[in-house]
Amino acid sequence: IDINNGENIFTANCSACHAGGNNVIMPEKTLKKDALADNKMVSVNAITYQVTNGKNAMPAFGSRLAETDIEDVANFVLTQSDKGWD
């Protein structure tokens, strides 16, 4: 697990829609801790699955990112949600 790599992957691939843990497409589906819990996205496996396969307006990144990069970004998201995206 490489949180720094996860941050770099997030910045390059996710921040256009999810900067600061927000969601510009679906404002209620943020990456904040309470929203992740409401949407059952509180594990690396759940986030990894969604990043890999996509859902609704979110594209699938499984063919664009390495599995280890997806795991790193999932760990980064969970770490940031615990810290409040400061």
Curated annotation (Swiss-Prot):
Q: What Gene3D superfamilies does the record tag this protein with?
A: Cytochrome c-like domain (1.10.760.10)
**Signal peptide feature range:** none
* Pfam families referenced in this protein's UniProt entry, alphabetically: Cytochrome_CBB3
Which superkingdom is the protein from? Eukaryota
Q: Give one GO molecular function term.
A: iron ion binding
Where heme c binds, per the record, is at 14, 17-18, 58
Keyword list (alphabetical) reads: Chloroplast, Electron transport, Heme, Iron, Metal-binding, Photosynthesis, Plastid, Thylakoid, Transport
Q: Where in the cell is it found?
A: Plastid, Chloroplast thylakoid lumen
PROSITE patterns found in the cross-reference section? CYTC
One Gene Ontology term, aspect cellular component? chloroplast thylakoid lumen
UniProt keyword annotation of Transcription present: no
Q: What is its main location?
A: plastid
Give one GO biological process term: photosynthesis
User: What is known about its processing and modification?
Assistant: Binds 1 heme c group covalently per subunit.
Subunit composition and interactions: Monomer.
Question: What family does the entry list?
Answer: Belongs to the cytochrome c family. PetJ subfamily.
Q: What does this protein do?
A: Functions as an electron carrier between membrane-bound cytochrome b6-f and photosystem I in oxygenic photosynthesis.
Return the PANTHER family for the record.
CYTOCHROME C6, CHLOROPLASTIC
Record-given protein name: Cytochrome c6
